[in-house]
Structures are given as C-alpha cells and as structure tokens.
Curated annotation (Swiss-Prot):
The lineage of its organism: Bacteria, Bacillati, Bacillota, Bacilli, Lactobacillales. This is ATP synthase subunit alpha. Its EC number is 7.1.2.2. It is a peripheral membrane protein. Belongs to the ATPase alpha/beta chains family. It comes from Lactococcus lactis subsp. cremoris (strain SK11). ATP binds at G169, D170, R171, Q172, T173, G174, K175, T176. Produces ATP from ADP in the presence of a proton gradient across the membrane. The alpha chain is a regulatory subunit. One of its GO terms (molecular function) is proton-transporting ATP synthase activity, rotational mechanism. PANTHER family: ATP SYNTHASE SUBUNIT ALPHA, MITOCHONDRIAL (PTHR48082:SF2). InterPro entries: ATP_synth_asu-like_sf, ATP_synth_asu_C, ATP_synth_asu_C_sf, ATP_synth_F1_a_nt-bd_dom, ATP_synth_F1_asu, ATPase_F1/V1/A1_a/bsu_N, ATPase_F1/V1/A1_a/bsu_N_sf, ATPase_F1/V1/A1_a/bsu_nucl-bd.
Length: 500
C-alpha cells in the first residue's frame, strides 16, 4: 500500500490546528508573610492596584501595596489556612460582586455569599465593588422626598431621594433605630433598601433581621453583614459592596436607600490594614487617604438625570462619637462630605425624648427642596421655635417671674417636644404627621395637658380615619393642605368628643 505524503501532512496539520494545550499561563508569586488579614508576596511584578489574586488554597486577595520588592495583599477570606511559601497567582480581574433582584430578602456577606441558610445565590449579574461615581452632568437636583416616617426628621431635617444624610451620635442613642424605622416606612413606596452592618455583633444583626422580617420589610430589603468576628478586609469592603448592589437598581431607574451602620468601624478596620501594610500613619494614626475612603463611597449616592432613567440612591451613613464630640477627625470628615447631619444627643435620649434628635445641631442642606408643600407650611418655623424654647428653658432656671408671651412660648415648646416623640418601629404616614403638626402650630394643643399630648395624637388619628378620611386624602393626593377652616372645624369636632 502506497503511503500518500500529502494526506499524512494534511492530517498532521489538522491535528496541530485542533490542538489545545491543557495548561494556562499565569504570573505567580510566593507568599513571604501572612497574618492579621494581610499577606505579602514576592514575584507578582506586574500586579495592578486593586487586582484580585488567588492563593493556592482558593482564597482570594486584593493587591493594595505595590512595593519595589513585593506586593501587599488584603486577604478576602480565611487567612489562617495560608502559609509562607504558598503560591499566589494574578487573576487579571478586579473585585466584582453579585447584584440583582434575587438578593432582595437575603442576608449576604461582603463577597455576596449568602449567610442566612436559605440556599445558594446565583444572580447571573455582577458589578465592580469599586465604581466611579456619576459625574455632574449625569445628576439632577434632589427633588423627591424620602419619608422616614419620623416626625422629628420629616419636619425638621427632611431628606430627599439621592441625598447623603449623616446620622451621628454616641453609642446607644438610637442611631440604628432611626434607620430601621426609615426602612420600615418605605413599605409600598417603590423603594429598595440595603442595610450594611459593619463590625456589629452577629446577635445584634440577627435581631435587626428578625425585626425586618416580622414587619414584612425583608420583602424589599437586602442585608449585607461583616460582623465584628470577621477579618478587617471584609469590614473595609462591606460598604462598597452595599453601594454596588444599590447601583444596579439605581441605574435601572429604581430608588434605593442604603444604610451604612457604621462608617467609624470601617475607618478603624482600614486604619488597621494600613498600619499592617506599613503605610505612613497620620492624625489619630489614620492613613492620609481616610477622607477619600469615605468620599468615594458617599459620592456614589445620587439622583440621576432623566436621560439615565431618573433613579436614585440615598445614603444614610452612621458615625459613632465619643462623649458627643462631633469635632473628631472622622466625624468632621463625613460631615463635610454629606448633605447634612442628624445629631442624636445622649441627654435627650436619657430624658425620654426619642428619637433623641438635637434640632440645633442637626441640618439638612438639600432636603428642604424635596419637602411636600403641606409639610413646609406646618413645619416652617418649627426649628426656630424649638431652638428658642431650649434657650428660654435654660433661662427659666434662674428665675420664675415670666411674662405671658414667654410663658406661652414655653408651653408651646413643651408640647412641641412631646409631639416630636415617637414609639419604636411605629413610623407615621406623612398626612398624619402634617395633621398633628398643624394642630400644634395652630394652637389646638395649647389647652391639652403636656402628659396627654401623645394620647391626644393617637385618638385624633383614629377620629380622622373614621370621620374625616377625605381631609387626609387631600394631603396624600395634592401634597398640600386642605382648606384650613375645614381642618380647624374637624379638630374642634374631635376635641368636643373628648375631654380635651
């Protein structure tokens, strides 16, 4: 049988063309140090800042320090199973996280992995954890209100969709309660909420999740948790992971509320990592870029222009103060980044004023534009009235001889303080907030004993629901007050049916 050379050569060519090697080319290095959530590796000469690397045990890390001889890596997982001498390879990718509607109702860690025992998650969509904030021309002014359901906030320091409003105060002053109430009030408002718990006890996070689940708020909420027992790198990236999840909804024309509880612990985790990576310390041993740590996160919250779908992401960052010191380093940084702050005061909290909002120190720099007309009319002078009441109250300690006008101001002020109190997890619809504030500012509460104000409020709401629902509907539909004569008449009718 004759051997045909051309057939053999064509077969060999085909074999060569179809040959695929079963190996991959990757730049690898060797771990020279590991501990406390960081690793150093020699040999990754072309690694880029923020690039993901993979250790030989499958754990991922992120390149942070690019030194002349080695690379400083933060370990995104269990660093205890990594040993000196292990190999580490570049992946050529940046860190991405799962995003999408499948996350709603779930509790996940900062890597997007579920920790609630409700099964695996595979959304099929990812977004980079670190993303560039929208530019000036991609945004528009804050114009829609975000109702928190808390009278003290919606009246005195209103928040708009797309705003960044800092919640600041000592530990145990009700910061988390304010945010949970704001989340509860988004039910039926076409809003998706993301609660990012940073450095909290796992038992505390579980309690918050159970509260949200019991009150049906998990139907529109995602919880991202990096608990106190987890390594610092996870606490550092948790807020960015929450922001990435929110951006997916925002860029699809939806409205998102993201709560960062709290950024003080993220700053501490970042300080720890920076010192371990041998970066030069600055004030209070924080690294020089700690301002950028928070500014690049909070700038991602925005109200997008109509061309981009008009979606929004509202941020409620928390900062924990020490003994009410709002002039501390991290506190002043975040105050300067955000569009206002709500200051919760220890003394008010312990005197029974809850939420313990200090009207004098709290401000909203852009939310006023988003406040509904009805609320603007009834709450316009409330801040000033409350501030002058606090001042007068301090003076009355020195003497009891007061003229009638001063006495009237004090009486109105005491009732204002009572009206702004609110029970936990009982957010109030905006039309009912307007109603009670109208009654207060138009003198209908002046003859009601201070101790009975909250009882008066509850009974008045029930009375209006039963007999004057049309007046409440006018506020809901038109966002403006109904005829004042009709409102006055209805409130008087209620007072005639009671002992007030």
């Amino acid at each position: 049988m004759a051997i045909k050379a051309n057939e053999i050569s064509s077969l060999i060519k085909k074999q060569i063309e179809n040959f695929t090697p079963d190996f991959e080319v990757a730049e690898t290095g060797v771990v020279t140090y590991v501990g406390d959530g960081i690793a150093r590796a020699y040999g990754l000469e072309n690694a880029m800042s923020g690039e993901l690397v993979e250790f030989s045990n499958g754990v991922l890390g992120m390149a942070q320090n690019l030194d002349a001889t080695d690379v400083g890596i933060i370990v995104l997982g269990d660093f205890l199973s990594i040993r000196e001498g292990d190999t580490v390879k570049r992946t050529g990718k940046i860190m991405e996280i799962q995003v999408g509607e499948e996350l709603i109702g779930r509790v996940v860690n900062p890597l997007g992995q579920p920790v609630d025992g409700l099964g695996e998650l595979n959304t099929g969509k990812t977004r980079p954890v670190e993303a560039k904030a929208p530019g000036v021309m991609q945004r528009k002014s804050v114009s829609e209100p975000l109702q928190t359901g808390l009278k003290a906030i919606d009246a005195l320091v209103p928040i708009g969709r797309g705003q960044r409003e800092l919640i600041i105060g000592d530990r145990q002053t009700g910061k988390t309660s304010v945010a949970i109430d704001a989340i509860l009030n988004q039910k039926g408002q076409d809003m998706i909420c993301i609660y990012v718990a940073i450095g909290q006890k796992e038992s505390t996070v579980r309690t918050q999740v159970e509260t949200l689940r019991k009150l049906d708020a998990m139907d529109y909420t995602i919880v991202v948790t990096a608990s106190a027992s987890q390594p610092s790198p996870l606490l550092y990236i948790a807020p960015y992971a929450g922001a990435a999840m929110g951006e997916e909804f925002m860029y699809n024309g939806k409205h998102v509320l993201v709560v960062y509880d709290d950024l003080s612990k993220q700053a501490v985790a970042y300080r720890e990592l920076s010192l371990l990576l041998r970066r030069p310390p600055g004030r209070e041993a924080y690294p020089g870029d700690v301002f950028y740590l928070h500014s690049r996160l909070l700038e991602r919250a925005a109200k997008l222009s109509d061309d981009l779908g008009g979606g929004s992401m509202t941020a409620l960052p928390f900062i924990e103060t020490q003994a009410g010191d709002i002039s501390a380093y991290i506190a002043t940084n975040v105050i300067s980044i955000t569009d206002g702050q709500i200051f919760l005061e220890n003394d008010l909290f312990y005197s029974g004023v809850r939420p313990a909002i200090d009207a004098g120190s709290s401000v909203s720099r852009v939310g006023g534009a988003a406040q509904i007309k009805a609320m603007k009319k009834v709450a316009g002078t409330l801040r000033l009235d409350l501030a002058s009441f606090r001042e007068l109250e301090a003076f009355t300690q020195f003497g009891s001889d007061l003229d009638e006008a001063t006495q009237a101001k004090l009486n109105r002020g005491r009732r204002t303080v009572e009206v702004l109190k609110q029970p936990l997890h009982k957010p109030l619809a905006v039309e009912k907030q307007v109603l009670i504030l109208y009654a207060l500012t138009h003198g209908h509460l002046d003859d009601v004993p201070v101790d009975d104000v909250l009882d008066f409020e509850t009974k008045m709401f029930d009375f209006f629901d039963a007999n004057y629902a049309d007046l409440l509907n006018v506020i809901t539909d038109t966002k403006d007050l109904p005829e004042e004569a009709k409102l006055d008449e209805a409130i008087k009718a209620f007072k005639n049916t009671t002992n007030y």
